[in-house]
């Protein structure tokens, strides 16, 4: 048994030198500058594939030599923290660069494009082993990263002409059909500050309001509502005088002749409110300002005598550009506290909003004339007042109303 252990121990002593002294495989000589270099190799189904490239060779992460130490204040040597670095080397090898003679007129510390190295993390020189070569590489490294090419300064010339929704007058001519052509065909000539709301650029001519008779005829109907739901309307005096008696209760009903309204400004200038901005009246119930005492007036006339049978009321709504024709832009909005009607735009009031009616609770069934007037008191100058009135024939049965023959009328 002792002899077997001795033989095993001597065999291991003879086998270890054989492993250490075995000749290692010779390393391949460095590739010549500009030669193809194998960068990626893989095997699939017994076949070996290689991807060759002339680009820079990727060097794996390296750690600093473990023998590199830094002296302490007490004289003892302490190992520096090992920082992994990622070195990207150019296509030229070290031996090829060593054989390249340096010109006499070039300074020794001047970096060359072919010998630059970029480090992914911080690197400090050390005094061990190849410290001199690392210090040389550190000197040749650029102190700052290269500037990114996609960080461009802001440009002010790439904005489009006509890309300002608050400036419908985008051409310097006097054509009232402004902004008719495509506004994205030519670049903006210079920096142009966007003006505020309600600003007119050149107000040549006058506005011209025209109500839409077909819009009224298509959606006229009768509705009954309780006084409880008409509190806001009663605050703005949109009901007949009988609705304000002391004996009227919240569950009493009123009969309303509802109809929509759409007014277009077909002139060449903005239709602006007659009252100055500081005198606009705030209505907390509807949460908007009334900028005119009377923008529209609604009357119900007898068909034969033309006598007023229902108490008409003034409608002083909030003026805004609800919609515009193609090529025109909205510039006035009640929510932005700017009121007016731009050329080519419409101020539309649906039939289901407050005060868009005539109170016909005390009207008997029969044939009547519905008269809708815009700018009735001529408080705002217009180019034509003969198209401000719409007259419709109304047949009221006591439960339903039928509108027909709505036309533009001069009176």
Curated annotation (Swiss-Prot):
The record marks 212-213 as: Cleavage. It holds the Pfam family Lysyl_oxidase. Disulfide bonds join 232-238, 285-334, 318-324, 345-355, 392-406. Residues 207-411 are annotated as: Lysyl-oxidase like. The modification Sulfotyrosine is found at residue 181. Cu cation binds at residues 286, 288, 290. GO terms for cellular component: collagen trimer; collagen-containing extracellular matrix; extracellular matrix; extracellular region; extracellular space. The lysine tyrosylquinone cross-link (LTQ) is generated by condensation of the epsilon-amino group of a lysine with a topaquinone produced by oxidation of tyrosine. Its EC number is 1.4.3.13. It is found in: Secreted; Secreted, Extracellular space. It catalyses: L-lysyl-[protein] + O2 + H2O = (S)-2-amino-6-oxohexanoyl-[protein] + H2O2 + NH4(+). GO terms for biological process: aorta development; ascending aorta development; blood vessel development; blood vessel morphogenesis; bone mineralization; cell chemotaxis; cellular response to chemokine; collagen fibril organization. Coiled coil: none annotated. Its cofactor is Cu cation; lysine tyrosylquinone residue. The keyword Glycoprotein applies. Aorta and lung. Residues 22-162 form a propeptide. Keywords: Copper, Disulfide bond, Glycoprotein, LTQ, Metal-binding, Oxidoreductase, Secreted, Signal, Sulfation, TPQ. Its main location: secreted. One of its GO terms (molecular function) is copper ion binding. InterPro entries: LOX-like_protein, Lysyl_oxidase, Lysyl_oxidase_CS. There is a cross-link at residues 314-349 (Lysine tyrosylquinone (Lys-Tyr)). Residues 1-21 form the signal peptide. Glycans are attached at residues 91, 138. Interacts with MFAP4. Interacts (via propeptide) with EFEMP2; this interaction is strong and facilitates formation of ternary complexes with ELN during elastic fiber assembly; this interaction limits interaction of EFEMP2 with FBLN5. This is Protein-lysine 6-oxidase. It comes from Rattus norvegicus. The gene is Lox.
């Amino acid at each position: 048994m002792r002899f077997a252990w001795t033989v095993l121990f001597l065999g291991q002593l003879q086998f270890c030198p054989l492993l250490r002294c075995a000749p290692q495989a010779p390393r391949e000589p460095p590739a010549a500058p500009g030669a193809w270099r194998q960068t990626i190799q893989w095997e699939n189904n017994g076949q070996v594939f290689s991807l060759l490239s002339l680009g820079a060779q990727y060097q794996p992460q390296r750690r600093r030599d473990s023998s590199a130490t830094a002296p302490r204040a007490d004289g003892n040597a302490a190992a520096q923290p090992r920082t992994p670095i990622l070195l990207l080397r150019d296509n030229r090898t070290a031996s090829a660069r060593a054989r390249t003679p340096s010109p006499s007129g070039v300074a020794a510390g001047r970096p060359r494009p072919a010998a630059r190295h970029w480090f992914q993390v911080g690197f400090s020189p050390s005094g061990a082993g190849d410290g001199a070569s690392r210090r040389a590489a550190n000197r040749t490294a650029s102190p700052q990263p290269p500037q990114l090419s996609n960080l461009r300064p802001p440009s002010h010339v790439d904005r489009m002409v006509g890309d300002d929704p608050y400036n419908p007058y985008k051409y310097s001519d006097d054509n009232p059909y402004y902004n008719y052509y495509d506004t994205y065909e030519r670049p903006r000539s210079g920096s142009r500050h966007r003006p505020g709301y309600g600003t007119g650029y050149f107000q040549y001519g006058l506005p011209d309001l025209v109500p839409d008779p077909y819009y009224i005829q298509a959606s006229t109907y009768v509705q009954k509502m309780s006084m409880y739901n008409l509190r806001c309307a009663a605050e703005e005096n949109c009901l007949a005088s009988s609705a304000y008696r002391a004996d009227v209760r919240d569950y009493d009903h009123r009969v309303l002749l509802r109809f929509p309204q759409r007014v277009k400004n077909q002139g060449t200038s903005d239709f602006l409110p007659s009252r100055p901005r500081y005198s606009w009246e705030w209505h907390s119930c509807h949460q908007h300002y009334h900028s005119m005492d009377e923008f529209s007036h609604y009357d119900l006339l007898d068909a034969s005598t033309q006598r007023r049978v229902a108490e008409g009321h003034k409608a002083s709504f909030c003026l805004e550009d609800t919609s515009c024709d193609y090529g025109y832009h909205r510039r006035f909005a009640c929510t932005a506290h700017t009121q007016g009607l731009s050329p080519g735009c419409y101020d539309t009031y649906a039939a289901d909003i407050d005060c868009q009616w005539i109170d016909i609770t005390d009207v008997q069934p029969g044939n009547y004339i519905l008269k809708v007037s815009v700018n009735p008191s001529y408080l705002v100058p217009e180019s034509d007042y003969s198209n401000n009135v719409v007259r419709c024939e109304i047949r009221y049965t006591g439960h339903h109303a039928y509108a027909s023959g709505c036309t533009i009328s001069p009176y």
